[in-house]
From Swiss-Prot:
Enzyme nomenclature, EC number: 2.7.6.1
Molecular function terms from GO: ATP binding; kinase activity; magnesium ion binding; ribose phosphate diphosphokinase activity
Binding site for D-ribose 5-phosphate: 195, 219, 223-227
Binding locations of Mg(2+) 2: 170
Pfam families: Pribosyl_synth, Pribosyltran_N
Keyword NAD included in the entry's annotation: no
Pathway named in the protein's UniProt entry: Metabolic intermediate biosynthesis; 5-phospho-alpha-D-ribose 1-diphosphate biosynthesis; 5-phospho-alpha-D-ribose 1-diphosphate from D-ribose 5-phosphate (route I): step 1/1
Keywords assigned: ATP-binding, Cytoplasm, Kinase, Magnesium, Metal-binding, Nucleotide biosynthesis, Nucleotide-binding, Transferase
Role, per record: Involved in the biosynthesis of the central metabolite phospho-alpha-D-ribosyl-1-pyrophosphate (PRPP) via the transfer of pyrophosphoryl group from ATP to 1-hydroxyl of ribose-5-phosphate (Rib-5-P).
Subunit composition and interactions: Homohexamer.
List of catalytic residues: 193
Protein name, entry field: Ribose-phosphate pyrophosphokinase
Amino acid sequence: MNGDIAVFAGNSNKQIAEEICTHLGIQSGKINLKKFSDGEISVKIEDNVRGKEVFIVQSTSAPANDHLMELILIMDALRRASVSSISVVIPYYGYGRQDRKVEPRVPISARVVADLIEVVGLDRILTMDLHADQIQGFFRVPVDNLHFAPVLAEYVNTKKIDDLVIVSPDSGGAERARAFGKKVNGSLAIIDKRRPKANVSEVMNVIGEIEGKNCILLDDMIDTAGTICKAADALLKHGAKSVYCAATHGVLSGEAVDRINSTQFSEVVLANTIAIPESKKINKLKSLSVAPLFANAIQRIHTNQSVSTLFD
């Protein structure tokens, strides 16, 4: 990798940024990030970046508003420093779940965030497993939406799990589960959540054969973990031999870690798109690095090669 490229990291996930730089064979750019006494964010780029192709690594994870503002200010600082191009690497795109109007008088926040980022000025977005594919259309610049599935499939295949069933926790994720099942030679099951009538507990029906099988619950993220833990209990109740869980983004809000710990998961596998604090690291959680995938994409973008092969 030549000296015409620079990678800068915000505070949201410095570890993945450092791993990306290691795979690229470069040092991360020097940046001074701090807060003034009133909470305003201060940004100063310490390196000469004139004419460089710049990549900014920043997940808009919690605290989402701080990390989003930090990203925008880093972009502006670099643009004013006369870089040749800016590509933003957002491993986890916060506000992605608010991708449409679900009731009157609410914003489409995923689009608003896209507008905020784009108005500052950038050339490309590189992200992973957007909550909704249509978010790519909220930007006018190219968006490369990488997938955790190839990294996860490689890990699952090394475990050599017999009688494997890939389970979608809802009907919306069925296609994701089906596609992943082909990579690991697993069959498909879907959990159908129904509420028989008002004020009656939700019933989880399992569609597919899971009795005596090893199940992997597959989702794009784990937030409070309520859904996946209830789904795991339902699978075990229906005779599953074991239950694993795999998701790209470990948001892990509220009591998520406690819920996971008290549920009979054999293992919960996450990508490292969001930095997990030490207080939330438990034995059941397994983190897989997607830094090599992002580094490969960055290298291909830098050398004008196709990125599409990374989507397989």
